[in-house]
């Protein structure tokens, strides 16, 4: 009799323990993936893998605060290459990826929260190169380097400019500096950070041809309530000036 009572008490204790652990944890958690895309998201040590507090940048700071306010659990990992992390977020429930451009052709692939940043699309040339462009049509006469899987490279490919796509955008710095390409299609201010990391200067803007906003893209299975809660908190952060303050920390 006493043994049965003892076992029953153990069972009740286990149930209470499980309940307490559940109450202490956020009811929903996500796996967030990103890449080196300064100043929006980047590894503190500049390498191609980082986790949690070793990831820096405007968007990384904004996303962390947004999830904290929304009381949604998350892990954050920076990996390489970009098309791999993009594919994981596209295919795996509970995953998200940032920072990515919200293009019309991507609209129905994800659920979106943002914007978490904005940037310009530019064509760079060497400062000693007399290239001067007034349209993308003129750029077709030149060798253009771009980043594989990036919105800029995708758009130029669609337009028939046939950019040479690199797995690492930083490789385009070397190629432009050495004359292997004539133009580098890249984001501004992204290129300024990458060039500084490589210790290279001597580039100029040959054409500024678009502006775009950056988002957190969530797997389509993400509950609408989670998306709405994140967006509500981001909107509140923007109204408070929190997002502008985050941007100013990296200028």
Predicted stretch roles:
Residues 23-101, 108-109, 146:
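Extracytoplasmic small-molecule ligand-binding "clamshell" domains
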Residues 34-37, 119-122, 194-231:
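Periplasmic-binding protein-like
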Residues 38, 52-65, 126-160, 165-167, ...:
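Bilobed "Venus flytrap"/periplasmic-binding protein-like clamshell domains
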Residues 57-69, 216-250:
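Extended ligand-binding regions for polar small-molecule ligands
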Residues 68-69, 78-79, 83-95, 111, ...:
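Short helices/loops that flank or line small-molecule/ion binding pockets
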Residues 73, 151-167, 235-251:
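Ligand-binding clefts/hinges and TM-proximal coupling segments of bilobed small-molecule sensing domains
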Residues 77-138, 149, 205-207:
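Acidic, polar ligand-binding/catalytic clefts
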Residues 90, 100-108, 182-210:
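A ligand-binding cleft/hinge motif common to bilobed small-molecule-binding domains
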């Amino acid at each position: 009799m006493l043994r049965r009572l003892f076992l029953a008490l153990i069972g009740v204790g286990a149930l209470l323990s499980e309940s307490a652990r559940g109450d202490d944890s956020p009811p929903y958690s996500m796996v967030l993936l990103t890449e080196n895309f300064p100043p929006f998201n980047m590894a503190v040590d500049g390498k191609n893998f980082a986790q949690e507090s070793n990831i820096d940048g405007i968007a990384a700071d904004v996303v962390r605060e947004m999830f904290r306010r929304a009381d949604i659990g998350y892990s954050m990992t920076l990996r390489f290459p970009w098309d791999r992390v993009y594919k994981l977020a596209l295919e795996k429930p509970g995953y998200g990826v940032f920072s990515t451009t919200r293009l019309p052709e991507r609209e129905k692939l994800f659920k979106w929260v943002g914007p978490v940043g904005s940037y310009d699309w530019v064509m760079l040339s060497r400062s000693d190169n007399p290239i001067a462009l007034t349209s993308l049509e003129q750029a077709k006469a030149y060798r253009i380097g771009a980043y594989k899987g990036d919105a800029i490279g995708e758009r130029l490919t669609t337009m028939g400019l046939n950019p040479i796509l690199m797995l690492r955008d930083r490789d385009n710095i070397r190629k432009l500096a050495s004359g292997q390409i004539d133009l580098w299609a890249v984001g501004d201010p992204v290129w300024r950070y990458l060039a500084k990391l490589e210790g290279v200067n001597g580039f100029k803007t040959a054409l500024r041809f678009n502006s775009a906003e950056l988002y957190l893209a969530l797997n389509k299975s993400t509950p609408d309530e989670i998306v709405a809660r994140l967006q509500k908190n981001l909107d509140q952060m923007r109204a408070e000036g929190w997002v502008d303050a985050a941007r100013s920390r990296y200028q």
